[in-house]
């Protein structure tokens, strides 16, 4: 056993405004809450992890508040005093102690990896096998709910060379209205940008079978999670000249294997939180590669810490055919890092410093911490 142990664990909720309302088929977001967790080790290393969700509990069973409670009440007491360098052993222990709670586990695993990378003087990507790329292509989601506003937003992104791939949130309106929305945006951006859509499970199989060919005719190249059922998604496969991507139904390696077994998607949206952490997401990607399923780096609209953790993982992938959507920090009005991330030329630069390679602006975070409360668990 290493002499380096976990000394204490702190959690807090940070409520941050967004640049505009973000409209999905399931809900509309007016801000984002980050659950931040800090792991303090006896050698002085401090790791930071983050948990977020999309629109509170509208997307899934966990919320930032639930993550914080799970860590404070169950995970932190089980980790304090344990060997901080045996990350996979610790995560296996937590997996036996508490079922599911993938988002909370991902936040803790990120913090442990951040601390270990700082301890060893290497980037998290090196702890995951080594990066294959320094920069990642990043798509932007158009989700204002208004066609003209989305077009203006897309044109601005193209002009400043920040994004040239756009994912449109649809599914909340009538099918013909949504398809007209997609077609109009693609008509304006033309060959300057690619257009994809995310339905967030809003359609029935019958609706999807009608809408997907129309989306293909409109110039859409990928449809994300059009239906809620894995079986329905599998039945839709290979019927249309558009790639179909699994997202919400991907809840870790077990789900990934079952979807791959029935050839249930063209593309997997890899998300560290939804998978249960970076190592679990790595296994999801390995299953996809073995099955010939292509990869896309997804987001839970995370802040900087989960975004960068995801970037370190995605940078290590052999295949990343559909790029990423790691734009979460750009949706938030407040910069919580001492040095902003580098988004330029349609890509994100993966930080190369020890650990995650980023530093929290403590004063900024204190201003937005809910009720000024920070929970500390120590021996």
From Swiss-Prot:
Keywords: Aromatic hydrocarbons catabolism, Isomerase, Manganese, Metal-binding. Coiled coil: none annotated. Its EC number is 5.5.1.1. Gene3D superfamilies: Enolase-like C-terminal domain (3.20.20.120), Enolase-like, N-terminal domain (3.30.390.10). Mn(2+) binds at residues 198, 224, 247. The keyword Magnesium does not apply. Catalyzes a syn cycloisomerization. This is Muconate cycloisomerase 1-1. The lineage of its organism: Bacteria, Pseudomonadati, Pseudomonadota, Gammaproteobacteria, Moraxellales.
């Amino acid at each position: 056993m290493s002499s380096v142990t976990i000394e204490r664990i702190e959690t807090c909720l940070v409520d941050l405004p967004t640049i505009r309302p973000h409209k999905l088929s399931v809900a509309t977001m007016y801000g984002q809450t980050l659950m931040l967790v800090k792991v303090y080790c006896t050698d002085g290393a401090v790791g930071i992890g983050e948990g977020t969700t999309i629109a509170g509990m509208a997307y899934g069973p966990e919320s930032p508040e639930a993550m914080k409670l799970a860590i404070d009440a169950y995970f932190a007491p089980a980790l304090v005093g344990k060997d901080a360098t045996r990350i996979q052993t610790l995560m296996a222990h937590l997996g036996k102690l508490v079922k599911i709670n993938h988002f909370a586990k991902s936040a803790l695993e990120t913090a442990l990896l951040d601390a270990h990378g700082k301890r060893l003087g290497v980037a998290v990507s090196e702890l995951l096998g080594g990066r294959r790329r320094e920069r990642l292509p990043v798509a932007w989601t158009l989700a204002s709910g208004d066609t003209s506003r989305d077009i203006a937003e897309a044109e601005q992104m193209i002009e400043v060379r920040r994004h040239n791939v756009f994912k449109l949130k649809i599914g909340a309106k009538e099918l013909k209205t949504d398809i007209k929305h997609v077609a109009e945006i693609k008509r304006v951006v033309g060959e300057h940008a690619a257009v994809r859509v995310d339905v967030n499970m809003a359609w029935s199989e019958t609706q999807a079978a009608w809408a997907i060919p129309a989306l293909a005719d409109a110039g859409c190249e990928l449809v994300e999670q059009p239906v809620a059922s894995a079986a329905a998604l599998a039945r839709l496969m290979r019927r249309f000249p558009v790639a179909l991507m699994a997202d919400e139904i991907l809840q870790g390696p077990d789900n990934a294997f079952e979807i791959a077994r029935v050839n249930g998607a063209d593309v997997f949206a890899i998300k560290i939180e939804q998978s249960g952490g970076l190592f679990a997401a790595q296994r999801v990607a390995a299953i996809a590669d073995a099955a010939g399923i292509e990869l896309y780096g997804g987001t839970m609209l995370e802040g900087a810490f989960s975004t960068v953790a995801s970037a370190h993982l995605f940078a290590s992938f052999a295949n990343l055919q559909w790029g990423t959507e790691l734009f979460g920090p750009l949706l938030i009005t407040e910069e919580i890092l001492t040095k902003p991330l580098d988004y330029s030329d349609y890509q994100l630069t993966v930080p190369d410093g020890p650990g995650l390679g980023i530093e929290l602006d403590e004063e900024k975070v204190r201003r937005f911490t809910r009720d000024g409360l920070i929970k500390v668990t120590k021996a």
